[in-house]
Amino acid sequence: MKNFNLLAVSSILLVDLFRTHWGHNVDFSKAINLNGVSFSNVDASSLGAAQVRQSASRGRGLGENPKEEDGADKKKKKDEKQVEPKKPRENKLKQPVENADGNAGGNAGGNAGGNAGGNAGGNADGNAGGNAGGNAGGNAGGNAGGNADGNAGGNADGNAGGNADGNAGGNAGGNAGGNADGNAGGNAGGNAGGNAGGNAGGNAGGNAGGNADGNAGGNAGGNAGGNADGNAGGNAGGNAGGNAGGNAGGTAGGNADGNAGGNAGGNAGGNAGGNAGGNAGGNAGGNAGGNAGGNAGGNAGGNAGGNAGANAGNKKAGDAGAGQGQNNEAANMPNVKLVKEYLDKIRSTISTEWSPCSVTCGKGVRMRKKVSAANKKPEELDVNDLETEVCTMDKCAGIFNVVSNSLRLVILLVLALFN
């Protein structure tokens, strides 16, 4: 084995010697791995030198060629130089239009936006927005909005909104809103809103709202709202709201004299004399004489005389009594379970007569057949065929007394015997 190892190492060294002289690229790692050679007895320095040379040659075998890399870099740089764009000739470039001193964007000197000198927006000198000299918005000299000189909004001289001289809104001289001279809103002279002279709202002279002179709202002279003279709201003379003379509200609202709301004299709301709300004399709310709310005489709420709320107290008492009766009835109903148990005990002897109580002391149950089930056989009977009730036995005290007395006697006898 030792001879074999020496032979393998010497073979590797010889081949490596030939490789360095003849430039052959050979990978000896595979050969070593395949043969499974052990290097335990081989000189370490020899193996180290061989591995260094082997790794260098392996790198060249994998295609690492520094010469080729240099050539590629040079070619890449050359391509980059060819891709660079050529600088354009300066004499072919278009130059931006130079503005005059103090201008922006090619305007004339002191202008903005292509306007003439001192203008804004293409206006004449000193104008804004294409207006004539000293104007704004295409108006004549000193005007605003296309108005005549000194006007606003296309109005005549000194006017606003197309009105006559000194007017506003197309009104006559000194007027507002197309009114006559000194008027507002198309009214006659000194009027407001198309009213006659000195009126407001189309009323006659001194009136408001188309009323007669001194009236308001189309009323007769001195009236309000189309009423007769001195009236309000179409009432007769001195009345309010269409009432008779001297009345208020029919007397108010079409009532008789001194009445309110269509009631009889001195009444309110269509009631009889002195009444309120259509009630009989002295009544309120349509009740009988002296009543309230349609009740009988002296009553309240539709109750009989002296009662309130349909005998609410009695009704409550009746309800309470009914509730007590229901409670008593429930208390007298025996337990269904006890009934079934007792029925099973006395099934063969039960009849239409009451049975003995199910207990001898305290509360129990007793039962009998119903008349309709009198002919039924005992085995066919059920709870629905029986009449039942709770029964109470009072023998408990007597039994207790007998037992206690007996115990006393026993105790006395025992004491006597031992003494």
UniProtKB/Swiss-Prot annotation:
Residues 99-314 are annotated as: 54 X 4 AA approximate tandem repeats of N-A-G-G. Pfam families: TSP_1 (PF00090). The keyword Heme does not apply. Residues 345-397 form the TSP type-1 domain. During host cell invasion, proteolytically cleaved at the cell membrane in the region I by a papain-like cysteine protease of parasite origin. Cleavage is triggered by the sporozoite contact with highly sulfated heparan sulfate proteoglycans (HSPGs) present on the host hepatocyte cell surface. Cleavage exposes the TSP type-1 (TSR) domain and is required for productive invasion of host hepatocytes but not for adhesion to the host cell membrane. Cleavage is dispensable for sporozoite development in the oocyst, motility and for traversal of host and vector cells. O-glycosylated; maybe by POFUT2. InterPro entries: Crcmsprzoite (IPR003067), TSP1_rpt (IPR000884), TSP1_rpt_sf (IPR036383). Residues 65-95 have a biased composition (Basic and acidic residues). Essential sporozoite protein. In the mosquito vector, required for sporozoite development in the oocyst, migration through the vector hemolymph and entry into the vector salivary glands. In the vertebrate host, required for sporozoite migration through the host dermis and infection of host hepatocytes. Binds to highly sulfated heparan sulfate proteoglycans (HSPGs) on the surface of host hepatocytes. This is Circumsporozoite protein. The lineage of its organism: Eukaryota, Sar, Alveolata, Apicomplexa, Aconoidasida.
